[in-house]
Amino acid sequence: MAKRGKKYLEALKLIDKEKTYSLDEAIQKLKEVEKILQRKFDETVELIFRLGVDPKYADQMVRGSVVLPHGLGRELKVLVIASGEKLKEAEEAGADYAGGEEIINKIANENWIDFDIVIATPDMMPKLAKLGKILGPRGLMPNPKVGTVTTDVKRAVTEAKKGRVEFKVDKTGNLHVPVGKISFEDHKLKENILAVVDAVLKAKPPGAKGQYIRNVVLKTTMSPSVKLNPAELQKALETKAA
């Protein structure tokens, strides 16, 4: 195990590992930890779920996307693969790159991946198949389940630019979702987090048995984890919706 620095150990004392915190308390704890750690970069805040699913079964796969109300805190580069009028639509919506087979060949031949999200029209998907080994492992392959295979290119690009994030449970039942930057105001982080919780709840698969959300923690890139109370999160969602 890597040796922890003095600042990290000092920050660790702020968090009670046996306690589950309310969302407001957890955000405050992370802000206090950040003051101690004094990182030289604006750390990403991440929500990590432990789900009661076994994703090796198709009816227990958890996958989806959500538009964060306040974005991720960084500009995402969007690539659209389409043809004809859809290319013009993509450019007008603000896509960073837009093209057809020439873009596909560039990725295949040059291993070019200077983008964060790939959106494709359905007619281009057969041609994209050869990019599976390049885009797949990086989570960049377009998928209709998360809205990146669509004929509504304008909407997809607009949502991506606003801060749409995709999520997919890993083989161990864990789900990692970025929710913003530590520099965000508390209420913005909270609203982003609740949007993610809502999306994950709505993505509950039909084969899930027993407790769906078993554990949730909030952390930054380099900080210790802060445990959240799943029941309190759902209550906060209900309060927001009321």
From Swiss-Prot:
SUPFAM superfamilies, sorted: Ribosomal protein L1
A Pfam family that the UniProt record links to this protein: Ribosomal_L1
Keywords: Repressor, Ribonucleoprotein, Ribosomal protein, RNA-binding, rRNA-binding, Translation regulation, tRNA-binding
Single GO MF descriptor: tRNA binding
GO cellular component: large ribosomal subunit
Gene3D superfamilies xref list: 3.30.190.20, 3.40.50.790
InterPro entries: Ribosom_uL1_bac-type, Ribosomal_uL1, Ribosomal_uL1-like, Ribosomal_uL1/biogenesis, Ribosomal_uL1_3-a/b-sand, Ribosomal_uL1_CS
Ribonucleoprotein among keywords: yes
Family per similarity comment: Belongs to the universal ribosomal protein uL1 family.
Role of this protein: Binds directly to 23S rRNA. The L1 stalk is quite mobile in the ribosome, and is involved in E site tRNA release. Protein L1 is also a translational repressor protein, it controls the translation of the L11 operon by binding to its mRNA.
Protein name: Large ribosomal subunit protein uL1
Organism: Sulfurihydrogenibium sp. (strain YO3AOP1)
